[in-house]
Amino acid sequence: MKYMVVLKIRIMINQHIKLVLSFALVLFGCINPLYEEDIEEFYHGKTKEEMMNYFSKNKDNLEAIEGLWTLGVIRTLYIYGIKVVTESEPNRMDLAVIKEGDLFRIYKMNGDPISFIASFTQTDESGIYDYKCYFTDTKDMVSTTANLLDNSMLRYEYDAPKGILMNYYYKAGPYKGSKEVKRIIEDGNMRLNWKFFWFKYVSIDSTKTYLARMDS
């Protein structure tokens, strides 16, 4: 009996290796959606011009976390606690972090509309931020703690919520509609861990750096 269970898991792992490699998940960011209109507003993001003007005007007074960043991610899929596959994307996207009230909002650097709402909030501990993310497609919310290192690197991680797993493993893809996949997700036996690494763009002349990155 034990042999059959192990064999079944191995078969599932082989299937999900193929599945995860075909899994072109668009990275969702995350924020705390206090109001419905807040969500609607941030669908549209900020324009390049608005961000350029902000960084140019405030270049000498920016908070440590503010600026332009490149984001990388390491994704690891687990099934029944067994690591199936790990894949990395070192330069997933370029993002801008801008202070708005008590929040540090996250925007796509190129000004394109966003499919997520995300922000950092400073804590009482230096270099530690609360990160919140609202997935607009699935209406899932995640939160975690982010570490700012040397004012130039951000690091945090979390597991993809069940709504995301359902969308990309059960409702779509080669195993669309699979009852076995649905059961594994609902039982919490499928876990997709995301580790995020942000690296800040740094230059002696920060204004020129911002403008160059925005125009590229």
Predicted regions and their residues:
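Amphipathic/hydrophobic helical signal segments and adjacent flexible N-terminal regions
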Residues: 7-21, 29-86, 171-216
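Central antiparallel beta-sheet cores of small beta-barrel/beta-sandwich binding domains
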Residues: 55-56, 63, 70-157, 165
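Extended, compositionally biased low-complexity polar/Lys-Gly-rich tracts
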Residues: 89-104, 152-154, 163-166, 183-208
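Intrinsically disordered, low-complexity interaction hubs enriched in FG repeats
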Residues: 147, 154-157, 166-183
